[in-house]
Amino acid sequence: MTNIRKTHPLAKIINNSFIDLPTPPNISAWWNFGSLLGICLILQILTGLFLAMHYTSDTTTAFSSVTHICRDVNYGWIIRYMHANGASMFFICLYMHVGRGLYYGSYTFTETWNIGIILLFTIMATAFMGYVLPWGQMSFWGATVITNLLSAIPYIGTDLVQWIWGGFSVDKATLTRFFAFHFILPFVASALAAVHLLFLHETGSNNPSGIPSDSDKIPFHPYYTIKDILGALLLILILMLLVLFSPDLLGDPDNYIPANPLSTPPHIKPEWYFLFAYAILRSIPNKLGGVLALMLSILILAIIPLLHTSKQRGMMFRPISQCLFWLLVADLLTLTWIGGQPVEHPYITIGQLASILYFMILLVLMPITSIIENNILKW
């Protein structure tokens, strides 16, 4: 009798995706982040669901309801901090996952890569709207500053911003709709993740060498299930260390002050995972130019497959490209640091140089370096 795992319509899909899936035998720990992102998404949906049971999306009670969750709800504090720090873990895994794709040339699976970019935008939008919900000072002013950027769009800008606000400023209508979107978008992300996986399984996984591995595959279970469990345990360990020992390490103290439209905080800044993009936005003195640079800093990923000039897929055997890649990582860390600093000398200049370097590496230096490496190898 055939195994039900291989015949049942639903079990068959799970079997072909997570059990009998033919996988390259040499994929490293950098391939763990896909499953870790899935775990992060499930964790965020579950903790978010329990938070939504006690949260009220009204300007007069939102801040109090979050305080109530932390003080009065059974284990509300741990749910709240797992959700807040879970978002940080989510973005750490996201950036590692995208970095892996860039390093090993996984972007040559264009459908998977493009769905991934849409997923990235979806999760960024979700995180931004979630940051507004506690209705602290940084929530309110962050929402005001970021939504105001849309007013840079010629002709329709102002009307568009007021349409998103649901009034003439960030107020009750804005908070209610942000809560609605913050609740629905993770489910959209789940559907997109399924499509992401569907396209990946059409081609099979890439591997560190970049060489096709069709002739040499191993089943996903037990080899990679056990490896993913180890990754998941490490993820949960780091998350719980954060939650239980320093839950506010990555947050902003200003968000413990209730939102006050009459008092602007001295330094308005987003959560740490958006600081690199915020630094790029601030480094351009023109409003529209800044908004375009902000969008392009992520959208640039979409044209990476078109800029692939190397005859090798990954960077495993391309030392000059490797140096450029790590320079890009250092540049992004510099931008993250600059995004959290006040707008004054020397931070302005450093931010502008780091922003120029970011686009230079991706658009100019990497394609040229790949051509040079091809010539060195006489390919």
Swiss-Prot record:
Keywords from the UniProt entry: Electron transport, Heme, Iron, Membrane, Metal-binding, Mitochondrion, Mitochondrion inner membrane, Respiratory chain, Transmembrane, Transmembrane helix, Transport, Ubiquinone
Binding locations of heme b b566: H97, H196
Major site of localization recorded for this protein: mitochondrion
Xref: InterPro entries: Cyt_b/b6_C, Cyt_b/b6_C_sf, Cyt_b/b6_N, Cytb/b6-like_sf, Cytochrome_b, Cytochrome_b_C_euk/bac, Cytochrome_b_N_euk/bac, Di-haem_cyt_TM
Domain of life of the source: Eukaryota
Cofactor: heme b
MF-aspect GO terms: metal ion binding; ubiquinol-cytochrome-c reductase activity
Listed Gene3D superfamilies: Cytochrome Bc1 Complex, Chain C
Residues the record lists as binding a ubiquinone: H201
PROSITE patterns, per database record: CYTB_CTER (PS51003), CYTB_NTER (PS51002)
Further details from the record: Heme 1 (or BL or b562) is low-potential and absorbs at about 562 nm, and heme 2 (or BH or b566) is high-potential and absorbs at about 566 nm.
Function field: Component of the ubiquinol-cytochrome c reductase complex (complex III or cytochrome b-c1 complex) that is part of the mitochondrial respiratory chain. The b-c1 complex mediates electron transfer from ubiquinol to cytochrome c. Contributes to the generation of a proton gradient across the mitochondrial membrane that is then used for ATP synthesis.
Family affiliation: Belongs to the cytochrome b family.
Protein name: Cytochrome b
Taxonomic source organism: Lobodon carcinophaga
Gene: MT-CYB
